[in-house]
Amino acid sequence: YPVDGIHFDDYFYPNLDDSKAETWFDYPEYQASGTSLSVAAWRRNNVNELVRGVYSAVKSIRPQALFGISPEGYLQNLRKDTRQFTDVDAWMTQSGYVDYLMPQIYWGFEAKQNGQAAGYAFANCLNEWVTLKKKGNVKLYVGLALYKTGTDAVDGNEVPEWQRYHDIMK
């Protein structure tokens, strides 16, 4: 049957906290490519080509179908060279990649890190995504983790906000 769209959920490239590129699983392919790009730029380009290819395939089969991705919600992590090689800036601002992005903003409004408001707190993340959205025509939807409601205790507070506020999802 005709589908309404294709959605990549939990798009994550293998997280490579090791900054030594020669230890990465795809380093031999990188060397064989003969590119002048850095390993990080090469990987980001490979991901961009994959995303652009899927978008093109979806549109060639059913032009009205949508294609979207749910990347991590914290833009600072997405933009690091040893993390996920996700070029959401290009995806959001250039045509031919996605119809929408749905960042997984799964942190609370009062998330803390080292006793301070965390950069990844919900409002901070949302504001960064909205700012990026203003630079392009791609739709922005926010992914929420309802399965964490009432159970998530990793917001850095003694009592999670899900338990402190009864109207948080209103």
Residue ranges and their predicted role:
Residues 34, 64-78, 126-166:
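Active-site clefts of carbohydrate-active enzymes
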Residues 15-18, 77-79, 109-120, 150-156:
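Extracytoplasmic/secreted cell-surface and envelope-processing proteins
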Residues 98-111, 117, 121, 125, ...:
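Loop/turn-rich, solvent-exposed surfaces of beta-rich toroidal or solenoidal domains
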Residues 20, 59, 80, 112, ...:
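Context-gated lysine
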